[in-house]
Amino acid sequence: MVFQVVCSTCGKDISHERYKLIIRKKSLKDVLVSVKNKCCRLKLSTQIEPQRNLTVQPLLDIN
């Protein structure tokens, strides 16, 4: 599971491509072959976050 990612320029959902990168561990070069918009390619290339443990809910610290 990955967090939903939408390109801020064109509005396209690029979560599936991010799933391939993080979960399936495909190379960025292989994933970018199927992405046609330059803005989406740039977002995938520059804003990759490491895989998170999604079973733990974050706690709010209000001080």
From Swiss-Prot:
Protein EC: 2.7.7.6
One Gene Ontology MF term: DNA-directed RNA polymerase activity
Listed transmembrane segments: none
Induction: Expressed in the early phase of the viral replicative cycle.
Catalytic activity: RNA(n) + a ribonucleoside 5'-triphosphate = RNA(n+1) + diphosphate
GO cellular component: DNA-directed RNA polymerase complex; virion component
Subunit structure: The DNA-dependent RNA polymerase (vRNAP) consists of eight subunits encoded by early viral genes and termed according to their apparent molecular masses Rpo147, Rpo132, Rpo35, Rpo30, Rpo22, Rpo19, Rpo18, and Rpo7. The same holoenzyme, with the addition of the transcription-specificity factor RAP94, is used for early gene expression.
Family, as annotated: Belongs to the poxviridae DNA-directed RNA polymerase 7 kDa subunit family.
Name this protein carries in UniProt: DNA-directed RNA polymerase 7 kDa subunit
Natural source organism: Variola virus (isolate Human/India/Ind3/1967)
Lineage: Viruses, Varidnaviria, Bamfordvirae, Nucleocytoviricota, Pokkesviricetes
